[in-house]
């Protein structure tokens, strides 16, 4: 059994943690549990991950205790892993490249699925982001068997990805469908709106004056009579015999709008893709594959100027090459977005952070999805390259770069202008321990900016590092830090201090 104790940051608050992580091996299965308790300096227990108040909450609590369940290895005919997914790719990555459901851990603890199957009928690969969301995001790729080459001339695969409701990325503690940020009663699923801020929900049985103007606006005969009686007593008159004695005093209550209900107003997005690949060199220490791929996104986005709905677009890779030379790997693609409204590798490491966010502008809070921002991209074309290399037996490094030229929306010009759309990703991993440093990892991602080397952060920026240091036999100090960004005021930048989101975990793990 392993365990850990330390501190974590959840929703901006520091909590102490005690965790027990027993592992149960069975045949080719490995089952690891994650029994974690959080408490603050006052002894208050963080109960969101120990909530049995309803059937749905109980289900999620039980699922939450699964650290992982794995079967086999990725090279086996059958492999799957249930739990935290560090990295998921589909095919050559036109839709899914580097997706992770663990970027907000431990603040958000997702339990997903990574699956691969290989047999004479072909191969299949799939993933699910989180069973607690009742499968919010699902992706599948089918690669046809080799005997289909007579039909397609080379190996072919089809992919589909669906996010059935982008709003599921918003936190909703009580499960009433209203995200916590717009729910006036985030821990009570019976109530969600309090227009006058008096502590009584608009739908509370004792709330007769919802807008707080002193005049009853809910038809309750006792409350109405009480109002007229009190008014009559104040002015020295008896209204009990008047015709209006049974009438509502307030005929036009001014109430706050109903908050978003993600259960009744889902916003899905999906995509289809096809890819062809043909190996031209296959040797022990070298292989080269040429490929092509195309994808069509399904859904609508918004024109950044008019707000009109636009259909999502298509991305094409008419030519790509992937190669491995000993310790190095290299890939290159020529990319095209014929009509705009498309993003390559849409489901990437930062997707759960960009999926749906709240923006407050001019006193109004609204939900902004990643899909709604695709309207900023017009027709584009350019290249993408990736290099990975093992440096001896100690380090593994990787870097990716995209440079697209075409039409992008400019807020100052209020029009699409010719500009560059670039992305840069880099990572460095320690693959062999050095003295007491048992593991280390650094990563940086900057997507869809004019120049990623200006290091002007956006919502597409995510960076962090992890390290584990052995301080005694069987005892290790683990440190995790991640920084991402949110445009909370909708001004197009993330310069405000509260728009920087830091996630820090410090724990001491031990083996029994």
Predicted feature residues:
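Short glycine/proline- and aromatic-enriched beta-strand/turn motifs that initiate or cap beta-hairpins
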Residues: 1-21
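Signature for the C-terminal beta-barrel architecture of outer-membrane proteins
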Residues: 13, 44-45, 77-79, 94-96, ...
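Outer-membrane beta-barrel "beta-signal"
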Residues: 69, 176, 498-512
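Short, solvent-exposed loop/edge-beta patches enriched in aromatic
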Residues: 22-31, 73-77, 434, 471-473
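Beta-strand-dominated lipid-handling architectures at cellular/organellar boundaries
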Residues: 1-5, 286-288, 482
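Surface-exposed loop and membrane-interface regions of Gram-negative outer-membrane beta-barrel proteins
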Residues: 31-68, 95, 302-303, 309
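C-terminal closing repeat unit and adjoining cap/tail of repeat-based domains
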Residues: 466-488
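Gram-negative (and chloroplast) outer-membrane scaffold detector with strong preference
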Residues: 63-72, 76-79
């Amino acid at each position: 059994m392993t365990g850990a104790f330390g501190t974590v940051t959840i929703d901006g608050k520091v909590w102490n943690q005690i965790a027990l992580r027993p592992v149960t091996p069975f045949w080719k299965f490995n089952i690891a549990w994650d029994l974690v308790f959080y408490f603050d300096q006052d002894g208050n227990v963080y109960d969101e991950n120990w909530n049995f108040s309803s059937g749905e909450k109980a289900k999620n609590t039980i699922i939450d205790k699964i650290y992982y369940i794995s079967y086999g290895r990725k090279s086996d005919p059958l492999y799957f892993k249930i739990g935290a997914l560090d990295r998921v790719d589909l095919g050559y990555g036109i839709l899914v490249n580097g997706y992770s459901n663990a970027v907000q851990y431990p603040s958000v603890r997702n339990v997903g699925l990574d699956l691969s199957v290989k047999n004479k009928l072909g191969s299949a690969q799939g993933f699910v982001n989180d069973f607690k969301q009742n499968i919010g995001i699902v992706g599948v790729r089918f690669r046809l068997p080799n005997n289909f080459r007579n039909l397609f001339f080379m190996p072919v695969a089809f992919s589909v990805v669906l996010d059935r409701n982008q709003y599921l990325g918003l936190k909703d503690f009580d499960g009433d469908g209203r995200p916590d940020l717009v729910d006036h009663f985030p821990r009570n699923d019976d109530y969600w709106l309090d227009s006058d801020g008096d502590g009584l929900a608009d739908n509370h049985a004792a709330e007769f004056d919802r807008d707080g103007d002193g005049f009853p606006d809910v038809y309750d005969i006792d409350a109405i009579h009480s109002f007229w009686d009190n008014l009559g007593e104040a002015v020295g008159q008896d209204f009990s015999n008047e015709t209006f004695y049974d009438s509502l005093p307030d005929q036009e209550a001014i109430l706050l709008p109903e908050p978003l209900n993600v259960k009744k107003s889902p916003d899905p997005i999906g995509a289809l893709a096809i890819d062809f690949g043909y190996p031209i060199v296959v040797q022990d220490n070298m292989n080269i594959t040429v490929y092509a791929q195309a994808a069509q996104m399904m859904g609508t986005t918004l024109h950044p100027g008019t707000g009109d709905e636009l259909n999502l677009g298509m991305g094409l890779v008419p030519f790509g090459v992937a190669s491995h030379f000993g310790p190095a790997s290299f890939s290159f693609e020529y990319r095209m977005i014929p009509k705009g409204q498309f993003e390559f590798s849409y489901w990437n490491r930062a997707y759960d952070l960009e999926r749906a966010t709240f923006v407050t502008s001019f006193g109004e809070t609204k939900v902004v999805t990643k899909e709604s921002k695709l309207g900023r991209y017009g027709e584009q074309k350019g290249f993408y390259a990736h290099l990975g290399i093992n440096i001896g037996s100690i380090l593994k490094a990787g870097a990716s770069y995209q440079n697209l030229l075409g039409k992008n929306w400019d807020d100052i010009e209020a029009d699409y202008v010719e500009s560059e759309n670039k992305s840069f990703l880099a990572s460095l991993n320690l693959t062999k321990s050095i003295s007491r440093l048992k593991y280390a990892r650094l990563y940086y991602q900057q997507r869809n900016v004019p120049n990623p080397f200006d290091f002007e952060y956006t919502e597409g920026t995510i960076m962090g590092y992890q390290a584990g240091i052995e301080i005694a036999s069987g005892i290790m100090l683990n440190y995790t830090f991640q920084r991402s960004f949110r445009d909370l005021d909708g001004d197009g930048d993330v310069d405000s201090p509260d728009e920087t989101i830091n996630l820090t975990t410090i724990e001491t793990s031990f083996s029994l």
